[in-house]
Swiss-Prot record:
The gene is GDCSP. The glycine cleavage system catalyzes the degradation of glycine. The P protein binds the alpha-amino group of glycine through its pyridoxal phosphate cofactor; CO(2) is released and the remaining methylamine moiety is then transferred to the lipoamide cofactor of the H protein. Residues 1-63 form a transit peptide. The lineage of its organism: Eukaryota, Viridiplantae, Streptophyta, Embryophyta, Tracheophyta. This is Glycine dehydrogenase (decarboxylating), mitochondrial. Its cofactor is pyridoxal 5'-phosphate. The keyword Ligase does not apply.
Length: 1034
């Protein structure tokens, strides 16, 4: 009634306004998008009509338009930050009459799309409609109790971790911790992860996560090859390894001409002298628990390195692989409090000895000191990574699964060593009780080998037993027609064991219960494999076992890290855009989170429908014919795309085509990925405008015409411009027998305006964690699905357990192999991109690209009088990112990009991408979801810093001792008793007026990178060592 009364009053007011303009109200008829949801009723003059006088009050009766009845919770206006009025004003500031004229001048006409239209969700779903749609999909998934195992297990995710990390934008919107001074929280958590891994594996070095267990095993295989300097070309894999791991290793080995042999342990043969390494599983994929001590001694005696894939929960009670003699240990931390999620994302790990530290893939966190000498954390040994060493890098892996590693680390912190041991013993006890019960039943045969959590059963008809289990909503693993395995986990109950007895009884009565026979069950672990070495002894793993304490610890770490909750993160080529809450919500729904990746597909029809819809939408957006959702990172997508091209050439008999042309401006992952595929890399330069030198490219293509495999190109270029000759570049490659691989890192400037397929690319990976809104998670997760033209679709990756391929499926299939451990990669985070695309609609997502370009050009225009803008397109505009040239400042003021980035921290900002793709520069990418006010604030900060630099150039402040060289300035430095700086504390802390209202504070002074690598420490140190260092510098 109240709403009706208000509407009537507003109607009369509008009617009076129409007949008496002198009382018009701008507030009511403002075109702003911020007008309330009532605005359609009160601003639509065309809907007002005169009618008869009612009750003598002169009331006007009005019709209501259909538009007024549409839902008001549309999404594009929440994601695309600039209002229409701001768009016009910003375009005018840049020198154009409106947004569209700017876009016309920026995107080459030769590649411009007239329009893009979705076949589904074209107008975009509202947020409430999207939630309802996702709930409908979720209802089509069936949650069965999983006993499949094979590296994936149900787990009880502590709700304090679920709510305060996985669902917390303060954790999931952070970027990779390149700016260590504003990342000490997640760096500490990742150091906890590394410490947990080293303690449990018994090896001294661990990285901060890898993509999945299978990928980690493939990386370990590559390490073995590198350790042997490529002189031994055979790698043996034990048949007791997970099938997906075996297939991933086989696929990876093709790229560097390594022969993979799968064999039973008893048949291993080193007599050829050509074996670089072996891979074994501990415990085995079918549950068997073997003592590898003598096996490893024999391998070492033959000069062979041993990789062991292991299970973290098992290692809490089993002798660690390091003590058995393993050289490298890999595995997954999924069962440490991370949902199965139909395959991921999960944090894998790789641990090894100090001897091989520089051959390790992935990020590694190390302990260093800051400029005051106090302990501080940072990413260590970055010089071995792909963004520096390119094709000579240890791996193409960038950051991997930091968010999930943090969850697993907090799980370890929350439970502590005793809690983990209790969980492991309970799981082992349930498995033992089940095995004992089956022996009592006598209907099947139980394996005699010892086991940890997985029981192998021989039976007359495995399919019949599995079908009976399905009736009880349980999934078992069918190994073959006479073999089943049953894997137990943290969520299994004693009642589940009783149900399993009924399943295996095959109709016979069960004269006992699990509870009744449990006291008779003996530990199945041999005494020689029982763990005796303590682990997780550091206080951090023994302090936070109540929810209140862990909550405060999580909050304390979060407070040290800058995220999108605080300010824009304008990293070029990283696309740090809004990760909307509606997009994130389905990720933690049990109907998506609690499905095993190898569950029957009929139990995951909601997922399957989403995959189909998403594949169709991505094909529309990119101009491709089919997509694979399997690659679970951008780097994995690059590798997969190149392997598709390789498979295509092989199928045509062109085995010799192995030359890959790569511009010098390419992402470092490009040459690293090409090297992994066994390609010979030829680089081509750029011209003075930042474009690929087409004539140099033409000569390289023609000179290698017989052997040309591919070109890798990023569009728009990494220099932040739309190259006018991109269609000609594609034609040159095709005319010389090659395929065009497009790096999708800059797709945020293409969507709706052009497309890789339209331009002429044959294959492209998409960084869903950039363009399509999956959060960066402080260094992962990501997703890198690949789209291909029709002729490449048959070669898209498949999977040995659940066959997959292209979406839509091609007519024929000749899959290249397996890229990731799970059939659809990190399926759990695909709803994020799916909801973004569906809610934006074709027009909203096209406008996102336009506004991203507008924001970049606006910032470039604001900054151009203070810093040179290095590259522009033919009409003087930039794409969605641009490069600021700081090189002259090194000579005039001694200032380098790192100095500017550190001073930006004092202004409350994360620095842009430093010294890439051009050394001595900053690359800035604002994205479409940052407001004009935020853009202005960042520009003001950079302009203010330029004024500070000018003071150095004028000689007014010291060349080496100034506010920029001293940045950042944490509170402990500002509050110290002694202040010896030649500038005031106040100016160091508050260089801009907005900071007085709210400021993000760094927690350390500038971190010493060189010290950290020269004194490499990659695990938690005893507290007394930190205290001694702190006292020494006090």
């Amino acid at each position: 009634m109240e709403r009706a009364r208000r509407l009537a009053m507003l109607g009369r007011l509008v009617s009076q306004t129409k007949h008496n303009p002198s009382i018009s109200s701008p507030a009511l008829c403002s075109p702003s998008r911020y007008v309330s949801s009532l605005s359609p009723y009160v601003c639509g003059g065309t809907n007002v009509r005169s009618d008869r006088n009612l009750n003598g009050f002169g009331s006007q009766v009005r019709t209501i338009s259909v538009e007024a009845l549409k839902p008001s919770d549309t999404f594009p206006r929440r994601h695309n930050s600039a209002t229409p009025e701001e768009q016009t004003k910003m375009a005018e500031f840049v020198g154009f009459s409106n947004l569209d004229s700017l876009i016309d001048a920026t995107v080459p006409k030769s590649i411009r799309l007239d329009s893009m239209k979705y076949s589904k969700f074209d107008e975009g779903l509202t947020e409430s409609q999207m939630i309802a749609h996702m709930q409908d999909l979720a209802s089509k998934n069936k949650i069965f109790k999983s006993f499949i195992g094979m590296g994936y297990y149900n787990t009880s995710v502590p709700t304090v971790i679920l709510r305060n990390i996985m669902e917390n934008p303060g954790w999931y919107t952070q970027y990779t911790p390149y700016q260590a001074e504003i990342a000490q929280g997640r760096l500490e958590s990742l150091l906890n992860f590394q410490t947990m891994i080293t303690d449990l594996t018994g090896l001294p070095m661990s990285n901060a996560s890898l993509l999945d267990e299978g990928t980690a095993a493939a990386e370990a295989m590559a390490m073995c090859n590198n350790i042997q300097k490529g002189k031994k070309k055979t790698f043996i894999i034990a048949s007791n390894c997970h099938p997906q791991t075996i297939d991933i290793c086989k696929t990876r080995a093709d790229g560097f001409d390594l022969k993979v042999v799968t064999s039973d342990l008893k048949d291993f043969d080193y007599s050829s002298g050509d074996v670089c390494g072996v891979l074994v599983q501990y415990p085995g994929t079918e549950g068997e628990l073997l003592d590898y001590s003598e096996f490893i001694k024999n391998a070492h005696a033959n000069g062979v390195k041993v990789v062991m894939a292991s299970d973290l929960l098992a290692l809490t009670i089993l002798k660690p692989p390091g003590e058995l003699g393993a050289d490298i240990v890999v595995g997954s931390a999924q069962r440490f409090g991370v949902p199965m999620g139909y395959g991921g994302p999960h944090a894998a790990f790789l641990a090894t000895s100090q001897e091989y530290k520089r051959m390790m893939p992935g990020r590694i966190i190390g302990v260093s000191v800051d400029s005051s000498g106090k302990p501080a954390l940072r990413m260590a040994m970055q010089t071995r990574e792909q963004h520096i060493r390119r094709d000579k890098a240890t791996s193409n892996i960038c950051t991997a699964q930091a968010l999930l590693a943090n969850m697993a680390a907090m799980y370890g912190v929350y439970h502590g060593p005793e809690g983990l041991k209790t969980i492991a013993k309970r799981v082992h006890g349930l498995a033992g009780t089940f095995a004992a019960g089956l022996k009592k039943l006598g209907t099947v045969q139980v394996q005699d080998l010892p086991f940890f959590d997985t029981v192998k059963v021989t039976c007359a008809d495995s399919k019949a037993i599995a079908e009976e289990a399905c009736k009880h909503k349980m999934n078992l693993r069918i190994v073959d027609k006479n073999t089943i395995t049953v894997a137990f986990d943290e969520t299994t109950t004693i009642e589940d064991v009783d149900t399993l007895f009924k399943v295996f009884a095959l109709g016979k009565p069960v004269p006992f219960t699990a509870a009744s026979i449990a006291p008779e069950v003996q530990d199945a672990i041999p005494s020689g494999l029982v763990r005796e070495t303590p682990y997780l002894t550091h206080p951090i793993f023994n302090m936070y076992h109540t929810e209140h304490e862990l909550l405060r610890y999580i909050s304390k770490l979060q407070s040290k890290d800058l995220s999108l909750c605080h300010s824009m993160i304008p990293l070029g080529s990283c696309t740090m855009k809004l990760n909307a809450t509606t997009e994130m919500m389905p990720v933690t729904w049990p109907a998506f989170a609690d499905i095993h990746p190898f569950a029957p597909t009929e139990q995951a029809q909601g997922y399957q429908e989403m995959f189909k819809n998403l594949g169709d939408l991505l094909c529309t957006i990119t101009g491709f014919d089919s997509f694979s959702l399997q690659p679970n990172a951008g780097a994995a997508g690059e590798y997969a795309g190149l392997m598709v091209i390789r498979a295509y050439h092989m199928a045509r008999g062109d085995h010799h085509r192995n030359v890959c042309i790569i511009p010098v401006s390419a992402h470092g992952t490009n040459p690293a990925s090409a090297a992994m595929c066994g390609m010979k890399i030829i680089t081509v330069g750029t011209d003075s405008k930042g474009n690929i030198n087409i004539e140099e490219l033409r000569k390289a293509a023609e000179a290698n015409k017989e052997n040309l495999s591919a070109l890798m190109v990023t569009y728009p270029s990494t220099h932040g411009v739309y190259e006018e000759g991109i269609d000609e570049i594609c034609k040159i490659i095709h005319d010389n027998g090659g395929q065009v691989y497009m790096d999708g890192a800059n797709m945020n400037a293409q969507v709706g305006l052009t497309s890789p397929g339209w331009i002429g690319a044959d294959v492209c990976h998409l960084n869903l964690h950039k363009t399509f809104c999956i959060p960066h998670g402080g260094g992962g997760p990501g997703m890198g699905p690949i789209g291909v033209k029709k002729h490449l679709a048959p070669y898209l990756p498949s999977h040995p357990v659940v066959p997959t391929g292209g979406i839509p499926a091609p007519e024929e299939s000749q899959p290249l192999g397996t890229i990731a451990a799970a059939p659809w990669g990190s399926a759990l985070i695909l709803p994020i991109s799916y909801t973004y695309i569906a809610m934006m609609g074709s027009q909203g997502i096209t406008n996102a690209s336009k506004i991203a370009i507008l924001n970049a050009n606006y910032m470039a225009k604001r900054l151009e009088n203070h810093y040179p803008i290095l590259f522009r397109g033919v009409n003087g505009t930039v794409a969605h990112e641009f490069i600021v040239d700081l090189r002259p400042l090194k000579t005039t003021a001694g200032i380098e990009p790192e100095d500017v980035a550190k001073r930006l921290i004092d202004y409350g900002f994360h620095g842009p991408t430093m010294s890439w793709p051009v050394p001595g520069t900053l690359m800035i990418e604002p994205t479409e979801s940052e407001s004009k006010a935020e853009l202005d604030r960042f520009c003001d900060a950079l302009i203010s810093i330029r004024q500070e630099i000018a003071e150095i150039e004028k000689g007014n402040v010291d060349f080496n001792n100034n506010v920029i060289k001293g940045a950042p300035h944490p509170p402990q430095l500002l509050m110290a008793d002694k202040w010896t700086k030649p500038y005031s504390r106040e100016y160091a802390a508050y260089p801009a007026p907005w900071l007085r209202a709210a400021k993000f504070w760094p927690t350390t002074c500038r971190v010493d990178n060189v010290y950290g690598d020269r004194n490499l420490i990659c695990t938690l140190q005893p507290p007394q060592e930190y205290e001694e260092k702190a006292e020494a510098t006090a």
